[in-house]
Amino acid sequence: MSYGPLDMYRNPGPSGPQPRDFNSIIQTCSGNIQRISQATAQIKNLMSQLGTKQDSSKLQENLQQFQHSTNQLAKETNELLKELGSLPLPLSASEQRQQKLQKERLMNDFSSALNNFQVVQRKVSEKEKESIARARAGSRLSAEDRQREEQLVSFDSHEEWNQMQSQEEEAAITEQDLELIKERETAIQQLEADILDVNQIFKDLAMMIHDQGDLIDSIEANVESSEVHVERASDQLQRAAYYQKKSRKKMCILVLVLSVIVTVLVVVIWVASK
């Protein structure tokens, strides 16, 4: 089985500043989350070969590269989500609701992918520690066997020379094993550092979800406030129309009364003039 680099999980396109508009960030985050899930599945597949005949330095190298690159991808997505939360809200209440739903779905998907990745990370760490323990035990057994042979076997000068050669070979093998153990211990330290990074991302994500809840409450409050203002404005318009209608009615009555009075005065003046 061949193991390639993690280029297939990196963001396509030229390098440069991250997109700043809402839709582009959403699209980039969605792609990152999908790549995190794919890489997690690949890490799980490589992990299953640890401690088997397929275990090798190449497998260790690819496993470390996959998990570290996936960790960087998770950190990048976390920063993009923070940037997403800092963007100004649209003026339309309907657009605010739509963006709110998109961010909720995105954070849920990211949380799920991140959780699966961390579970696999911890399992890899456990298997690596078991592998180191077995290697150390094997090195100790080799040293004990060599000491036992030195105590039980008597030999002449020729045999002594062969024994010295054998001991040198065993010492070389043991040194190689110890070097491999050191490499795996270094890999475990990096893995545990990456696990701590993921823990911090979870904390940031929890804070963003909390802030998102506050934002949702604010949006709903603004919507309710707008509805109240619309209702009040409607009531005021109805009252204004009522008062205007009532005022017109009074004006009509007043004009009619004045017309009657003027008519009476004209008649009186006309009669008096005769």
Swiss-Prot record:
The modification N-acetylserine is found at residue 2. Ubiquitous. Highly expressed in brain. Residues 272-274 are vesicular. It is a single-pass type IV membrane protein. Residues 1-20, 128-150 are annotated as: Disordered. Residues 34-80 form a coiled coil. SMART domains: SynN (SM00503), t_SNARE (SM00397). The chain crosses the membrane at residues 251-271. Keywords: Acetylation, Coiled coil, Endosome, Golgi apparatus, Membrane, Phosphoprotein, Protein transport, Transmembrane, Transmembrane helix, Transport. Associates with the BLOC-1 complex. Interacts with BLOC1S6. Interacts with NAPA and SNAP23. Identified in a complex containing STX6, STX12, VAMP4 and VTI1A. Interacts with GRIPAP1. Forms a complex with GRIP1, GRIA2 and NSG1; controls the intracellular fate of AMPAR and the endosomal sorting of the GRIA2 subunit toward recycling and membrane targeting. Interacts with NSG1. Interacts with TPC1. Interacts (via N-terminus) with VPS13B. SNARE promoting fusion of transport vesicles with target membranes. Together with SNARE STX6, promotes movement of vesicles from endosomes to the cell membrane, and may therefore function in the endocytic recycling pathway. Through complex formation with GRIP1, GRIA2 and NSG1 controls the intracellular fate of AMPAR and the endosomal sorting of the GRIA2 subunit toward recycling and membrane targeting. This is Syntaxin-12. It comes from Rattus norvegicus (Rat).
